[in-house]
């Protein structure tokens, strides 16, 4: 009864008002699975292709009607009649149909929408929650959240160079407690910023986006907020950064406009990070070097890889082939997992498996352009990732994922596992 009988895609809007794809997969039993595809602002060069129409008369050229048509008129006829429980077979059928490395014929957004909708339909058909359908009976670990409470870079219209300043409530005993701590710190930060006369408008991912005197001032106001909320920085709450360095890199030099000395060589960037790590309880730095600066990545990993989590996002783009090269060269010790960077559930699971076998941590991540779809939350529990990055404590597109994790924790009840600081198993704490 899990035979696919119909596949239908439509154009919807994401959290930034840009079009994206929503796909519905119908089964013989009458069951339906629905999935929406996210979209990024700062993207890696080697990401799978997000197919846009380019017609400037519609949505400023960002329409996705070509991708919709590819689902409804090309992919659908190839997978109708297949069993929804054959996830690997269906994903492979779509990859073969596309025939390109970066999914540039059908579009990664078209393929991913179908891939996720198939998984959701299959889970519904067999009567399992999505996290358990994907991960099996051992899927029970709730992730420690990386909460992006202050935005800069491509995620905000301000003068802050670093894209994301995040808190990780690692001292919590449960996901629900971690969420509460994060919310309290978020509200405390609003008070701190107001007290300094700063703007409290929010960026794409729900974090505050004020103009500040320096990147370091962002860390100072967050430290103040943690303490005002009644928590101890470095013990109960840790800090994490997403620098998105590819956006700052040109001709072998990094430019941080908000620093006293804006121009930095890769070695000077490592010095800059080491100084911050020595001064603040930073446990994780994502995309500290540009995606093509592999020598810089090696410098950063060698210097700080035993002390903190070094996360590759634009570097690895959730691609097992690129990740394998990074592992062989000893670059980074963690990978950010974004479903739409690679474009299918099967390939995403392959990347996670490869990372874990190499002793790399995995951080399941949203994109800056999100929807109300909560697949991300289920995926983080399905693979026992231990960490999730899904924005601030504001905007429904972000909070939807947190609320789904609360439901999952409730459902798992006494079998739920939350490891807090222990998720950083591959660094010295």
Curated annotation (Swiss-Prot):
The answer, when asked if Magnesium is one of the entry's keywords, is yes
Sites binding (2R)-2-phosphoglycerate sit at: 163, 338, 367-368, 389
Q: Which reaction does it catalyse?
A: (2R)-2-phosphoglycerate = phosphoenolpyruvate + H2O
Which Gene Ontology terms cover its molecular function? Answer: magnesium ion binding; phosphopyruvate hydratase activity
Question: Does this entry carry the keyword Phosphoprotein?
Answer: no
Residues recorded as binding Mg(2+), renumbered to this chain, are: 242, 286, 313
Q: EC number(s) on record?
A: 4.2.1.11
* Subcellular compartments: Cytoplasm; Secreted; Cell surface
CDD domains annotated for this entry? enolase
| GO CC, alphabetical | cell surface; extracellular region; phosphopyruvate hydratase complex
Under NCBIfam families, the record lists:
eno
Protein name per the record = Enolase
- Species in which this protein is naturally found: Geobacter metallireducens (strain ATCC 53774 / DSM 7210 / GS-15)
- Give the gene that encodes this protein: eno
